Curated annotation (Swiss-Prot):
Organism of origin: Dichelobacter nodosus (strain VCS1703A)
Protein name: Na(+)/H(+) antiporter NhaA
Predominant cellular place of this UniProt entry's protein: membrane
Record localization: Cell inner membrane
InterPro entries reported in the protein's UniProt record: Na/H_antiporter_dom_sf, NhaA
Keyword Transferase: no
Membrane topology: Multi-pass membrane protein
UniProt record similarity statement: Belongs to the NhaA Na(+)/H(+) (TC 2.A.33) antiporter family.
Originating gene: nhaA
Upper lineage: Bacteria, Pseudomonadati, Pseudomonadota, Gammaproteobacteria, Cardiobacteriales
Length: 464
């Protein structure tokens, strides 16, 4: 049950003006709170970006992308285009969110125990290695070889959005495997970015960045749970990373890994003290009036708020703070300013014969499917791990198809792989969009229509 919602307020103390505003905002709030709202927004903005890049708006669109934005404090300055501010600065918050999800899964989620983690880890490894090899088979030499990391990633937001549309066609445990697989994929992508897509290293800023990381670890070890301290030092680490040659977004992941995941109070302690506070609140003579009329009531609420914060882990609080701005502002901005690719029909024949197109498309659509499904089958055959009892082999095939939705992370890697190579970058982006759409359509249709009657097969093993 949900508490403290706008709807409950409307039934009691809402003024006529509040009711009118609430009614106007209701569709917007429902969209923001829907599980697939972010995915719908990303699809819409992808279309908008493509329209901008292929109409008379193209000149304006590119001018905005290349607009310089200077941040200066004394002699220190960072001067980048809006495009790079989004990709190197704002996307650091996306990678911070990714890092928080990785740490959560490794601590208490599906990756917390080796027994539960084996299947998604092997599936993710298969889903990274096979697409990279397929890409390399088409691009074994020349300047396009650097794009091998593009088809390795899975866009978790889009994959989960497709599963939500299917409502019950996939077992919950297999859905959890896909989520864990995508998180391991993200971890792999971060490692690839940090190691293989790094410019010439500047050692002084890099050492300073890792000193910041060491300070964050010491804060964690010392029981410091103030989020502002981690954000401040993490921001400083981002600046050093930016000048070090390592991609600055790595600072987001490192900050996440150093964020504490232990609370001050246990649930039992919180429950006991919160009940005492609420009893005092109810017994107070001013409890029937507005809190603004009583300092004592306000003090009780402040104590309750402090208790709530100290019962939540800093990691959970930061993840909650970041969730809406990351998925409804930062990632949409990234898509809007990175998915706009100018398509020249005159060059369509050359595009279709491009080794980049072949490597990315076959890597995402077929490489992911082959890699994920083969890894799961090998694990089950060798009894390294068991297929979830409520899952079927047909569902595993569908999950393998959905893993080919690269989108956000693939576009991000393509920007690094083909920096300064406009033609190859355009080819990669067009192919990522086409391949992700193909993988999503195949996965959805397979799980919707082919596995529709497969519920009775629940419990069958992959060997069948």
């Amino acid at each position: 049950m949900s508490y403290f919602t706008r709807e409950k307020h409307e039934l009691t103390a809402a003024t006529p003006w509040e009711k009118t505003v609430a009614k106007m905002l209701s569709p917007f709030n429902r969209f923001m709170n829907s599980a697939n709202g972010s995915g719908i927004l990303l699809v819409f903005l992808t279309i908008v970006a493509l329209v901008f890049a292929n109409t008379s708006c193209r000149e304006w669109y590119e001018r905005v992308l290349n607009q310089q934005l200077l941040v200066q404090m004394g002699s220190f300055k960072i001067d980048m285009t809006i495009h790079y501010w989004i990709n190197d600065a704002l996307m650091t918050l996306f990678f911070l969110m990714v890092g928080l999800e990785i740490k959560y899964e490794m601590k208490v989620g599906r990756l917390a125990s080796l027994k539960r983690a084996v299947l998604p880890i092997f599936a993710a490894l298969g889903g990274m290695i096979v697409p990279a090899l397929i890409y390399f088979s088409f691009n074994s030499q020349g300047e396009t070889v650097s794009g091998w990391g593009i088809p390795m990633a899975t866009d978790i937001a889009f994959a989960i959005a497709i599963l939500l549309l299917l409502k019950g066609k996939v077992s919950p445990s297999l859905t959890a495997v896909l989520v864990a697989l995508a998180i391991v994929d993200d971890l792999g992508a971060v490692i690839v970015i940090a190691i293989f897509y790094t410019d010439n290293l500047a050692w002084s800023p890099l050492i300073a960045a890792f000193l910041c990381f060491a300070v964050l670890l010491l804060l964690n070890r010392g029981g410091i749970r103030a989020l502002w301290a981690y954000i401040a030092i993490g921001s400083l680490m981002w600046v050093f990373m930016l000048f070090s040659g390592v991609h600055a977004t790595v600072a987001g992941v490192l900050t996440a890994l150093a964020t504490p995941m232990n609370a001050v109070y246990s649930p039992t302690e919180f429950s006991t003290q919160a009940r005492q506070l609420l009893d005092e609140f109810d017994a107070h003579p001013d409890s029937k009036t507005q809190v603004a009329h009583s300092r004592e009531l306000n003090d009780l609420l402040q104590q309750l708020s402090t208790g709530i914060q100290k019962t939540q882990t800093p990691l959970q609080r930061l993840e909650h703070i970041l969730n809406t701005p990351v998925y409804f502002l930062i990632v949409p901005l990234f898509v809007l300013f990175n998915a706009g690719v100018h398509v020249e029909l005159n060059n369509l024949n050359a595009l279709l014969h491009s080794p980049v197109l072949k490597g990315v498309f076959f890597g995402l659509v077929f490489g992911k499917l082959i890699g994920v499904v083969s890894a799961i089958m090998i694990c089950v055959k060798l009894k390294i791990a068991a297929l979830p009892a409520d899952a079927t082999f047909k569902q595993v095939l569908g999950i393998g198809m959905l893993a080919g939705i690269g989108f956000t992370m693939s576009i991000f890697v393509s920007e690094l792989a083909f920096s300064g190579q406009a033609q190859h970058l355009a080819e990669a982006k067009i192919t990522i969009l086409a391949a992700s759409l193909t993988a999503a359509t195949l996965g959805y249709c397979w799980l919707r229509f082919i596995t529709g009657a497969a519920k009775a097969e629940t419990g069958t093993s992959v060997s069948q």
